[in-house]
Design a protein with these regions (language model features):
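Catalytic core of bacterial c-di-GMP phosphodiesterases, primarily the EAL and HD-GYP domains
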Residues: 321
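Amphipathic alpha-helical interaction surfaces in cytosolic regulatory modules
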Residues: 324-345
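Short internal beta-strands
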Residues: 318, 342-350
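ATP-dependent carboxylate/acyl-activation modules
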Residues: 1-197, 202-316, 326-328, 337, ...
Length: 387
């Protein structure tokens, strides 16, 4: 689960992590009033959406007087903000964060995340803050520190010293940053986060560090332990189809391609997407029907993926185990009774009750269903149908 910057910063403040003063605004008048209350002569007017790249997309502006605050707030609030993380459809800006300015002398990047490859919590830090960290990693890998932490040991001084070394900090600056990282690490662990990112982390002329941005992502499976975090969920930021799918026990993520996928198991789903890409087509979604799929949930999956007008072919790839193939076949029939399906459906069923499933589909007389003998054959069929 993701939260907004202003929500993350409120959590930071509660845990002693330095941030600049700021207030959320839901209207232009409130934005101006917030700037007046904060005082000073410079403010950042920041769009609040669940995506990065807001500045490049025009969603972050620096105002040097109250008239500019009003002007920028008027332009940003209600805009459809498109960034490299939103996709071409963008996100509607419904709230702003008005933040006091600061005398910034240096920007850094800092993140704490779970490194699945290394099976460790990892601190990632760079002297190149305010930029796309993937670009820095590609062009200047020597400017990035990756410090692994064994959760059984926790964050120690030597971890912080390595970060300070790569960032080129002096002794006093290093002490301040290490103290800040220790608090961030504790917060990360205590709140069951997947990722905590500050980009940029700034150093002021006084040598102090502040989180100028804040991005926190939480483990959905652990939210029952943190009702105060669950309350921060903003469902307006979530894809409606993804939210609806979750209510039916389906894992669905919309993508930009034209081949809809319906698969059981996350691993097989990713392999299916890979082979679709390899064949020259593009997946339109990730959809895992899970281990408890029924005919009803399969029908719901059909309903959701067919709302995507970009979809030209549906590829159903099921390996029957816990999910019996005949259930999937009955779900396909149930879906086609209630929804008009005018596009080809490529079906690859193998495993438990695969023969029964094939018989069900054969007896249905559905003309737009094409059977695949294996995964490779399925991908080839999909590619030929997409064109």
């Amino acid at each position: 689960m993701n939260i907004h910057e202003y929500q993350a910063k409120a959590i930071f403040v509660d845990n002693g992590i330095p941030t600049l003063k700021g207030k959320v605004a839901f209207s232009v008048d409130e934005a101006v009033a917030n700037a007046k209350e904060l005082g000073g002569s410079v403010w950042a007017v920041k769009a609040q959406i669940h995506a990065g790249g807001r500045g490049l997309g025009g969603g972050v502006k620096i105002a040097k007087n109250l008239d500019e605050v009003k002007d920028y707030a008027s332009k940003i609030l209600g805009m459809n903000l498109v960034t490299h993380q939103t996709g071409p459809e963008g996100k509607l800006v419904q709230k702003l964060y008005i933040e006091s300015g600061a005398n910034i002398v240096k920007e850094y990047y800092l993140a704490i995340l779970f490194n699945r490859m290394a099976e460790q919590i990892t601190i990632i830090a760079s002297s190149e803050g305010g930029m796309d960290i993937e670009k820095v990693a590609k062009e200047s890998p020597e400017k990035i520190a990756k410090v692994g932490i064994d959760p059984q040991i926790g964050f120690k001084m030597f971890h912080g010293l390595e970060v300070a070394r790569v960032l080129g900090l002096d002794k006093d600056e290093g002490k301040k940053l290490i103290s800040m990282i220790a608090k961030l690490y504790k917060l990360y662990m205590d709140k069951d986060m997947n990722m905590l990112e500050i980009n940029p982390l700034i150093k002021t002329a006084e040598g102090d560090f502040y989180a100028l941005d804040a991005k926190c992502s939480f483990d959905d499976s652990a939210l029952y332990r943190h009702p105060e975090i669950a309350e921060l969920r903003d469902i307006t930021e979530e894809n409606p189809a993804e939210r609806e799918a979750a209510e039916f026990g389906l894992s669905y993520v919309k993508l930009d391609g034209d081949v809809a996928c319906m698969v059981n198991g996350a691993g097989l789903a990713m392999a299916t997407m890979d082979i679709i890409n390899y064949s020259g087509a593009k997946p339109a979604n990730f959809l895992d029907v899970g281990g408890g799929a029924s005919a009803e949930t399969v029908a719901k999956a059909f309903e959701i993926i067919l709302r995507d007008k970009n979809v030209k072919v549906i590829f159903i790839n099921i390996f029957g185990g816990i999910v019996r193939c005949d259930r999937i076949a009955n779900g396909i029939l149930e879906a086609t009774k209630n929804i008009e399906v005018n596009i080809p459906i490529v079906v690859r069923l193998d495993g438990t009750n695969a023969a029964e499933a094939k018989a069900i589909l054969d007896s249905s007389n559905l003309k737009n269903i094409k059977a695949a003998t294996n995964l490779k054959n399925g991908a080839e069929l999909v590619k030929s149908l997409v064109g």
